């Protein structure tokens, strides 16, 4: 299992990105969370089998139809303590 902390930049808020990401992460049996940040970026913690995490990262580079992802900063992280993948409030 691997875990990654992500910060996505570009047009990533107001385009349904969080719900889109929750759906894909759950399909891939990943754990973690996603939330909007006050600075206009999107933040996520994603954990699971390495191939599934990488598949979600590839999908995030495209994003949902109205999104325009210009950058993803990823760092390795500790896995979340709780199972499942959830949408969090803006932080």
From Swiss-Prot:
InterPro entries listed in its UniProt record: Acylphosphatase (IPR020456), Acylphosphatase-like_dom (IPR001792), Acylphosphatase-like_dom_sf (IPR036046), Acylphosphatase_CS (IPR017968)
Organism encoding this protein: Acidiphilium cryptum (strain JF-5)
GO molecular function: acylphosphatase activity
Substrates-to-products reaction catalysed: an acyl phosphate + H2O = a carboxylate + phosphate + H(+)
Lineage per the UniProt record: Bacteria, Pseudomonadati, Pseudomonadota, Alphaproteobacteria, Acetobacterales
Pfam family, any one: Acylphosphatase
Name of the featured protein: Acylphosphatase
Family affiliation: Belongs to the acylphosphatase family.
Keyword terms: Hydrolase
């Amino acid at each position: 299992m691997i875990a990654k902390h992500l910060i996505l930049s570009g047009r990533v808020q107001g385009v349904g990105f969080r719900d889109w990401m929750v759906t894909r992460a759950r399909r891939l049996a990943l754990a973690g969370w996603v939330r909007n940040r006050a600075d206009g970026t999107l933040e996520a913690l994603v954990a699971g089998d390495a191939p599934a995490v990488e598949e979600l990262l590839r999908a995030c580079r495209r994003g949902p139809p109205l999104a325009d992802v210009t950058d993803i900063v990823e760092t390795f992280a500790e896995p979340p303590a709780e199972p499942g993948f959830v949408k969090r409030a803006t932080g």
